[in-house]
Each structure stands twice: as C-alpha cells, then as structure tokens.
Amino acid sequence: MKKALVIRFLAGIYYIQDLDNQTILKAQKKGVLKKSNFIQDNQLKNNRDKMSIKVGDIVLYGMCYDKYLIYAILPRKNELKRPNIANIDQVLLVFSLVKPHFQTLLLDKFLLILQQHKLDVILVFSKIDLIEKEELEEIQQNMNYYFPFYTCYYVDSKQQIGIGVLKNIFEQKITVLAGQTGVGKSTLLKALIPDANLKTQEISESLGRGKHTTKNAQLYLFNNGFIADTPGFSKLDLGGFSYQNLKNFYPDFLKYVDNCYFGTNCLHLQETQCGVKEALTQGKIIPSRYSNYCYFMEEIKKEKKIYVKN
C-alpha cells in the first residue's frame, strides 16, 4: 500500500495526493476504517478505534480492480472538528476590519480555542482599504499588545497589498485559513492562488454576515506547502474550558501570577491581592483583554451552572 494526503472530500469521493509522485487521485473508503500505527517491523497494526477520514489525513491506499481504495488512516498529530481537518501546522486567523467589524472579543475567543489545541496562530487583518487611516493605526497599536505571542499581518487582498510578505510562511506546512464567515478568507486565498476555484462571498446587508461558499475543508498546493480553506465559523464554544483553567490559556497573564496572593490558584477576579489586576491598573494589560476574560468566565459560569461566593 502507498501513502497519500487527503486534500478534499466531495460526494463520497476522497481526493488524495500520492506522497511519492504527487499525483492526485480519486479514492473511496474501504468499509469501516480503523486507526493505524506502524510498528518496528513496518507492518500495519490496527486497533479497534473506528475512524472517519478528515482532510489533512495521511492514509494508506491501493488499487482494487478498477478503483483506488483507502484502507487505513495513519496517526494524527492533531485535529479539529470545526473545521473538520487534521495534521495542522499553523492557523492563519483572518479578521475583517469592516463588514463584519473587528471585535477583540471574537479574537480572544478564537485564540483560546486554538491555543487549547496547541496550534500556532498567525493573525491576518483584511479589508484595510475600507477603513480610515487613523482607525487602522489605532487597531494596529492595540494589536501590538498581542505581538510578543502572535505575528500580525494587514492586507488588502483585492489590491494585493501585504500579500507578498505572507507567501513565505506556507512552505512545508499545512496552514488552515480560519475566521468568521465573510471576513475575506476566500478572497485572501484567491489573492495567493489566483486559479483557486472559489467564489468571493457577498455580504448580506440585512444580516451583516457572509453567505457560505466554502462548504467543506479543502487543501490547495502553494509554495511547497498546503493551504486549507475552511467553512466560516458562526459559533464558538468554550465547553472545553473550566472556571479554574481558563486563566492558564492567557500567556500574557502568566508572568504576573507570582504577584498574586493565591499564586496559580488566583482567578484574577475578586481577589484582593492579584498581580494580573495590578498589571491592568498599571497599563501592562490592555483593558479589552481583561474585560473579555471576565466575560468568558461569566459565560463558563452560566454554562456549567457554577455558583461563586461573593
């Protein structure tokens, strides 16, 4: 059997790219697949865990009569459910500065979820041509706060502004384009790969959100790597976080924990001696970052019906 990368799934057909000769083939799944591992003698060993194929999977395939069949999925280094994709190297998180307007609340929620999956994140802000210069400079100044942890790019995909500097980050990686519907992911992909078969989304004036054109994740070969276009996000769930552990996903908070009376047990909310709140008052933490944290803590408390003594 040979190895291939799953680059697309459509109507029961998997489009796979052979890892040796780069040929793109159409294949079908052979019965119920099981998670596979290679052992020392290079023989295939199956366990009982049933698996569904995701875009980004490395699979074993072979010819059966007149068609190609996928027999097994090799171990994944990571995976997401929304979007449904595996073996991600980095996430290009795209935000629109207008239509829909940029919100730090949405940014921080995305960052939490992606950090929970231990994924490297690069921030891209689109539609810079539709915003006033002064407003753009203000946003850039606020985003400098995130710069020690995340690289930021500002682009106008239609005019190719800022696109050139992006091209080198894709080499030898599977990069996922992620973001809210209508932020310009498909337009950005079109700017990077002009022959990508995409339709630019129209923005619904009545709802202020984009209409779906990307139905399923798909990998596009680019600069010796792959870019994954994914469906837009309409809902982000914090169900994987707890009231106690959310703070651990704020790298900018961690350096102030030593100044908290309760140390790593401090929730940075109502405690009287809190290094994070002290850093906030000193301007070392931007107000939106902390207020979003409090909002998420309240969201988790309501969702999990946690009762906190005042």
Curated annotation (Swiss-Prot):
Its main location: cytoplasm. Its EC number is 3.6.1.-. GO terms for molecular function: GTP binding; GTPase activity; metal ion binding; rRNA binding. GO terms for cellular component: cytoplasm. Keywords: Cytoplasm, GTP-binding, Hydrolase, Metal-binding, Nucleotide-binding, Ribosome biogenesis, RNA-binding, rRNA-binding, Zinc. Zn(2+) binds at residues 260, 266, 268, 274. It is found in: Cytoplasm. Residues 77-236 form the CP-type G domain. HAMAP family: GTPase_RsgA. Monomer. Associates with 30S ribosomal subunit, binds 16S rRNA. One of several proteins that assist in the late maturation steps of the functional core of the 30S ribosomal subunit. Helps release RbfA from mature subunits. May play a role in the assembly of ribosomal proteins into the subunit. Circularly permuted GTPase that catalyzes slow GTP hydrolysis, GTPase activity is stimulated by the 30S ribosomal subunit. This is Small ribosomal subunit biogenesis GTPase RsgA. The gene is rsgA.
